[in-house]
Amino acid sequence: MATPYISMAGIGKSFGPVHALKSVNLTVYPGEIHALLGENGAGKSTLMKVLSGIHEPTKGTITINNISYNKLDHKLAAQLGIGIIYQELSVIDELTVLENLYIGRHLTKKICGVNIIDWREMRVRAAMMLLRVGLKVDLDEKVANLSISHKQMLEIAKTLMLDAKVIIMDEPTSSLTNKEVDYLFLIMNQLRKEGTAIVYISHKLAEIRRICDRYTVMKDGSSVCSGIVSDVSNDDIVRLMVGRELQNRFNAMKENVSNLAHETVFEVRNVTSRDRKKVRDISFSVCRGEILGFAGLVGSGRTELMNCLFGVDKRAGGEIRLNGKDISPRSPLDAVKKGMAYITESRRDNGFFPNFSIAQNMAISRSLKDGGYKGAMGLFHEVDEQRTAENQRELLALKCHSVNQNITELSGGNQQKVLISKWLCCCPEVIIFDEPTRGIDVGAKAEIYKVMRQLADDGKVILMVSSELPEIITVCDRIAVFCEGRLTQILTNRDDMSEEEIMAWALPQE
């Protein structure tokens, strides 16, 4: 076999105490399309950021074109022919096609001893590159006027302008129509014939089988298997992705389903988002005291649905009912007043006020629900604020020196407890947890699970979004699986709640 252009051996990457990559091996040959597979959080994106020079590895060796490196920076990686195209495209809509192709690297020529931009030469080279990728657009066209497919071709052209030998593509078909996917694959096949290697990250197994030559599967920050795509079945790939270790990964195990009567109190009927690609025709019901989990791949529509339910995003249709009444929130404030709470996946961006104390953060949501108190800015009087905070501190076993200390001084797990307590002050009936244990340690996770189960036992309806399959299997009574904006299955039988079964419903079938 030919000499590999890239060989990554024993790559590790730590962020403080968190080992994002443990020991990863990856080999990519010239003229091959190599699938990089794995669950959410397996380490695929981190590995590609190491290869493209964005992250410095903690250990391991990267060999490119027979030269070994302990680390790369972004500039060196580009010089060595490593290009990356992210799922969120980096082209700038306000600039023209030509300007996007030459951002930060204009060609120049000397006239009378002065360097000036050589627009003529740039146009000639740009036209040749667009011809190479089959992109028929005017160089002076604003990128904002291009389709998603054309923007993607422009990204490929930008990468090739840097003489890329390896192109990393992260979920490149996520926003493309079937016809546009066909066109992308046509260009990829042409690049393969020219000797360009492509690392292809995707969860769409039908696409992997159609376009890729070899594969590497990652799990929990390690590479577990590599081989030829035609030698394995889709079931084999799914088993490699999820492994064999299931419910026992966490110490905190879910006890029996709540003893509360199976009384349906929360219903979602035919909810569709205004952007119909995000959420389409979703219906389900939840009983009092039940934890309903939402599983699926990144971009499957879970968080988008929660935003619709809580009034963050507008709905095109559908109804949300609580205790038999249509509550369909028009805004987050309306949702709070109607008995809902939302603990978002981003604590720092959407969850807490970093300049406020623990007590002040706890007081915010109740102030909003009740329309304000007599204190300044509509918050509690200080005495009420302190009393409530101390009660919540004891209830949730919050570890802090004082409820008056700044919330940013707490660990991630304790910050999450503050967010939970903030919403408990509103006495909600429905609580949405979106990635409730992201970024916190195993011990803190167990405490959060315990809190969620206590809330369910108290009669609350819990909606839990999580990308960690062992977690969602452990904690939830039932699991709703999403794929590409649709609810594909609700798993109710404990025997069916395996990682393999969830992934089978979460992966696109076409």
From Swiss-Prot:
NCBIfam families: PRK09700.1 (NF007253). Keywords: ATP-binding, Cell inner membrane, Cell membrane, Membrane, Nucleotide-binding, Repeat, Sugar transport, Translocase, Transport. GO terms for biological process: D-allose transmembrane transport; D-ribose transmembrane transport. Its main location: membrane. It is an enzyme of class 7 (translocase). It is a peripheral membrane protein. The complex is composed of two ATP-binding proteins (AlsA), two transmembrane proteins (AlsC) and a solute-binding protein (AlsB). It catalyses: D-allose(out) + ATP + H2O = D-allose(in) + ADP + phosphate + H(+). The keyword Ion transport does not apply. ATP binds at G38, E39, N40, G41, A42, G43, K44, S45. Part of the ABC transporter complex AlsBAC involved in D-allose import. Probably responsible for energy coupling to the transport system. InterPro entries: AAA+_ATPase, ABC_carbohydrate_import_ATPase, ABC_transporter-like_ATP-bd, ABC_transporter-like_CS, P-loop_NTPase. It holds the Pfam family ABC_tran. Belongs to the ABC transporter superfamily. D-allose importer (TC 3.A.1.2.6) family. This is D-allose import ATP-binding protein AlsA. Its EC number is 7.5.2.8. SUPFAM superfamilies: P-loop containing nucleoside triphosphate hydrolases.
